[in-house]
Amino acid sequence: IESKFYSDFDIKLNINGDIKYQLLPKPHLLISDSSISIGENNNKNISFNIKNLKVFMNTNNLYPKSKINFEKFEIQNTNFFIENKEYSTLRNYFHNSESKPIYIKKSKVFLIDDNDDTLIISPIEKINFTTSQQDNFKKLNIKGNLFDLNFKLFWKKKYNSKMNSQIEIDFQEPNILIRNELNYDNNSSFEGTTSLNFLNQNVEIGYQLK
């Protein structure tokens, strides 16, 4: 299960609790206690402890065990503690992984500074991460709350490109819309455009680093 999970999601899974097979709402494995790790370098791994991890399976190919295919996994009611130094690892995962769908619901994200103090607590209603060769895009959707403001975040990049991405953040009450498009020439050279729409006023800024 652990090796297949890594193969399908590019995430390391350590199972520490019981595993139950459940049919509803769709066939899935319910893992009572586990941890997941993102990143190939042990010094830059991000690890999270997960209770009641649901790993959904392809119903057309449940047996034999050696041919089980996972379709997606789902996490609920989990606190994610992320340090400043771990941001680049997360970014690299979203940009470079070829994971099957990931769903996170009713959880919280804690951003921690270098002194182990909590900078931000963001309640998250849902996070969906999908990669698809069919429409040629990787997509990240987040719906949550930040500084008592409800927001929706949408990020996408071309599936076969590591250099271009787009992000849109929509805050509600007050209505603030931020869009950013980033184009990399290489790892150290990029250009982009950021636009801010607030009170029916739009400001657009272009930038580049060579």
Locate each region found by the language model:
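Flexible beta-edge/linker motif
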Residues: 17-115, 123, 130-143, 181
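Interface amphipathic segments
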Residues: 43-49, 64-68, 111-210
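Extracellular/lumenal and peripheral-membrane lipid-interaction modules
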Residues: 1-19
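A broad, low-amplitude sensor of folded, mature protein cores
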Residues: 6-12, 86-91, 165-167, 192
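Disordered, low-complexity tails and leader-like regions
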Residues: 1, 24, 31-32, 53, ...
